Amino acid sequence: MAVEVRFRPGARTDLFDLYTYIAAQSGRERAGSYIERIEAACMRLTHFPERRTRRDDLGPGLRTVGFERRATIVFRVEKDAVDIVRILYGGRDLEMALRDT
């Protein structure tokens, strides 16, 4: 059975905010490239997602994986999907960010 990747509203907002920030600092081309790489990393989570770090301390069933040492992808493995919950950049406090989700 194929597993789909779903971007939850918080993750979509994170991607938009991250694009806006990088575009302002480094240009739209660089921002677009970075977002594409994050999205590709999220899509690869369909391959053995259970191997990633489990973080039940942050919420039931949550897992995290680092991205290019600058971002953290927070996700949950469901029966038929990987739900991308948040994408946090630059060492943001995971507990605080997830509390707002």
Spans of features found by a protein language model:
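Short amphipathic alpha-helical/adjacent loop interface patches that line ligand
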Residues: 15, 19, 35-42, 91
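Basic/aromatic recognition patch in beta-strand/loop cores that engages polyanionic ligands
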Residues: 50-80
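Localized chelating/binding microdomains
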Residues: 6-10, 29-33, 37-39, 57-66, ...
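Intrinsically disordered, low-complexity segments enriched in polar/charged small residues
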Residues: 17, 59-60, 68, 91, ...
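Short proline/glycine- and basic residue-enriched helix-capping loop/turn segments at helix->loop/beta transitions
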Residues: 43-47
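Arg/Lys-rich, positively charged N-terminal/basic patches that mediate binding to nucleic acids
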Residues: 1-33
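Enriched for short, Lys/Arg-rich terminal
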Residues: 71-101
